[in-house]
Amino acid sequence: KEYIALLDGVLPRKNIQKHGTMELFFRLDVDNRPHQIWDEKNGKSAITEWEILGVEKYKNPQGTLKNVTRVLFKPHTGRTHQLRLASADSHGFGIPIVGDTLYGKCEAGERLLLHARKVSFVHPVTGERMSIECEAEF
C-alpha cells in the first residue's frame, strides 16, 4: 500500500531527511475512544516508511492558503490510525494531516487529505497479483 497525505504545515528545515522509516508504539486511549496514544511499553509497533515529496500551497474550502507538506507513506504494519499518528504525534512528524479531526484541527469544509494511491493484493480466486493505482486529486 502507498498513501499520499498533505501535512498541515511545514517541517523544520534543520536536520530534516527526505525519506526514512519510523517505528512508533501506540495503544487505544480507553478514556477517549477511538483516540490512540503513545505507549512505548504497552503499545503495538507501527512501522511506516515515508518520503517528503515537497512543500506547496493548499487553498482550503474557506479560501485560505496554507503551507503544507506532501508526504508519501508506505505502512509496513496496519495499525489503527497509523498514518495519522505518524503525522501528528510528537514522536513522528508532529504535524497533523490537513482535515484530521482526531489528532489535529479541521477548518470548516476541510476533509482528511489522506489518499490510498496504490493497493496491491493477491486475487482470492485466480491467485493473480493485482495492483490498483489512483493518484490523489489534491
Stretches with model-predicted labels:
Residues 1-138:
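RNA pseudouridine synthases
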